[in-house]
């Protein structure tokens, strides 16, 4: 009964994320852009699969991945062996990232890099930086220092790298901090932080996700220097015309076995690692062990449904709409529509509401959750608009990234460090599943129709969306600092103590 209630809650959250975009798409298709009936029917079916898949997946990830992170983190703290903590962190970082659904979707849409090569490259980057995160927690190294040093190195590498790979590299950093990796990394960090007994130990467990997102950027930039690109068709382009319901059913039935195999291979490393750890060291009791295994089954089923819906019916419609809206006067709708989608995507993301509440609590109510929510919505909406502006004009992604990250890192000197840690952790919150599954194909369709370069002009959308919370959260932190200083300067009202109150008629 309890699990059923939890599943219903997750399905409601998934529906709140998916339905706003679906309704916008339906409105566009009925009013502005004629879409083939078969493709639209496929989109409706894909929407249902996305809702069910996301609901099952998020419940399963909470039951399994978060628990595995907690259990292994707690066990590692007891060993107090640095080499063991680092080796396990690397292996877990790689294994958990391979199964990240947002990364699977992004990799399927990159036309010039083999999907498996890109996923493994990104996963190794996360694994290496997860090791660095453990070192930072154990030795209390400044998060700001690490962010400045590594982003400086990343941007130096970016200016020296092949310009065609830049946008994909920064997008990779945005999609890896998704619903699979974030709860796991956070749980592992909290467990390892418990080794320390000083007052800053808990605060240092924040910032792990933000630091880990640098790893994929660096590793993909390195990949661009050594890997020979291979032009290929993206999955968003690969939608064949659907002539009848039998053809529609055939498309989905043929896709299910393919994604069942993909998800099996993606989840296998983390499952094998957990089982080995369970029988060698962890030795959970029967009930907790079974709960984790049931959670893994939920995760598996959810991922299969999610990826099938995305690749067969959801992303292809985004691609088709983007292409159709470049015709004539409709091109001027690309930017406002992208901004509208950005507004609804961030508003519908459940993790965003948790972030808003965190900021409200940190600021002791000086920054309300509502004010934080509106600020994030405006920021992500602006990111969507800037991404489409790039598609139309071909402006380099580096113009926005250099300015944005410079501002984000500069703000870290003026706000409490916990605000900085939460800000860099929250980048993946904003770039939720719908950014990679719909908005990116939408940008790709528009870019191809305009004759642009998809690798340089369409990719980068996820990176812009992920960058905005870094600035927004810290701006709110700066407002909190200003308000706090003003409150300290205001003179307190003199306390005259309790005195006798004289009524007017008594004085007469």
Model segments located where?
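Intrinsically disordered, low-complexity non-transmembrane regions of multi-pass membrane transporters
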Residues: 1-14, 18, 69-83, 197-201, ...
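Juxtamembrane and boundary regions of transmembrane helices in multi-pass small-molecule transporters
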Residues: 2-4, 133-149, 164, 168, ...
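Interfacial loop-to-helix junctions that mark the boundaries of transmembrane helices
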Residues: 8-14, 35-45, 77, 110-119, ...
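Alpha-helical transmembrane segments and their helix-start/interface "positive-inside/aromatic belt" motifs
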Residues: 11-17, 41-47, 75-83, 143-148, ...
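Hydrophobic core segments of alpha-helical transmembrane domains in multi-pass membrane transport
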Residues: 19-32, 46-56, 88-95, 125-136, ...
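Transmembrane helix-loop junctions in multi-pass membrane proteins
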Residues: 27-41, 61-70, 95-110, 129-141, ...
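Transmembrane helical segments that form the transport core of multi-pass membrane transport proteins
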Residues: 45, 239-351
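Helix-loop-helix junctions within the multi-pass membrane cores of secondary transporters/permeases
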Residues: 74, 82-153, 331-412
């Amino acid at each position: 009964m309890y699990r059923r209630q939890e599943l219903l809650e997750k399905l409601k959250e998934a529906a709140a994320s998916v339905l706003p975009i679906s309704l916008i798409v339906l409105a566009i298709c009925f009013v502005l852009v004629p879409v083939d009936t078969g493709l639209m029917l496929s989109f409706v079916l894909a929407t249902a699969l996305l809702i069910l898949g996301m609901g099952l997946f998020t419940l399963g990830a909470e039951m399994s991945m978060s628990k595995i992170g907690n259990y292994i983190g707690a066990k590692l703290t007891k060993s107090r062996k640095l080499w063991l903590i680092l080796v396990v962190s690397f292996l877990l970082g790689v294994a958990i990232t391979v199964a990240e659904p947002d990364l699977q979707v992004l990799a399927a849409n990159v036309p010039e890099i083999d999907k498996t090569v890109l996923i493994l490259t990104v996963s190794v980057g996360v694994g290496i930086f997860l090791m660095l995160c453990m070192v930072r927690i154990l030795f209390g190294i400044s998060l700001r220092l690490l962010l400045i040093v590594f982003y400086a190195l990343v941007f130096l590498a970016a200016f020296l790298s092949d310009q065609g790979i830049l946008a994909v590299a920064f997008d990779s950093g945005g999609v890896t901090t998704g619903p699979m990796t974030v709860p796991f990394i956070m749980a592992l960090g909290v467990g390892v932080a418990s080794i320390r007994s000083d007052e800053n130990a808990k605060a240092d467990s924040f910032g792990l996700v933000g630091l880990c997102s640098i790893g994929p950027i660096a590793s993909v930039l390195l990949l661009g220097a050594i890997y020979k690109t291979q032009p290929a068709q993206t999955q968003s382009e690969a939608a064949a015309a659907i002539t009848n319901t039998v053809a529609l059913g055939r498309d989905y039935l043929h896709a299910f076995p393919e994604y069942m195999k993909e998800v099996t291979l993606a989840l296998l490393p983390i499952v094998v690692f957990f089982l080995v750890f369970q029988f060698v060291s962890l030795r959970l009791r029967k009930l907790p062990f079974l709960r984790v295994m049931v959670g893994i089954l939920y995760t598996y089923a959810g991922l299969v449904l999610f990826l099938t819906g995305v690749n067969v019916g959801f992303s292809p419609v985004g691609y088709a709409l983007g292409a159709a809206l470049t015709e004539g006067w409709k091109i001027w709708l690309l930017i406002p529509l992208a901004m509208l989608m950005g507004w609804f995507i961030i508003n519908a993301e459940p993790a965003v509401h948790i972030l808003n509440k965190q900021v409200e609590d940190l600021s002791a109510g000086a920054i309300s959750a509502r004010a934080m929510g509106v600020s994030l919505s405006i920021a992500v909406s602006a990111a969507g608009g800037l991404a489409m502006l790039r598609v139309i004009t071909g402006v380099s992604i580096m113009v926005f990234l250099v300015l944005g990250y410079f501002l984000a890192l500069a703000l870290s000197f003026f706000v409490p460090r916990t605000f900085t840690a939460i800000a860099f952790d929250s980048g993946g919150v904003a770039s939720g599943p719908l950014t990679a599954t719909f908005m990116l194909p939408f940008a790709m369709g528009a870019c191809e129709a305009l004759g642009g370069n998809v690798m340089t002009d369409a990719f980068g959308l996820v990176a812009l969306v992920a960058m905005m919370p870094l600035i927004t959260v810290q701006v709110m932190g700066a407002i909190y600092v200003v308000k706090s200083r003003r409150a300290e300067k205001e003179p307190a009202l003199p306390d005259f103590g309790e005195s006798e109150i004289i009524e007017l008629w008594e004085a007469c």
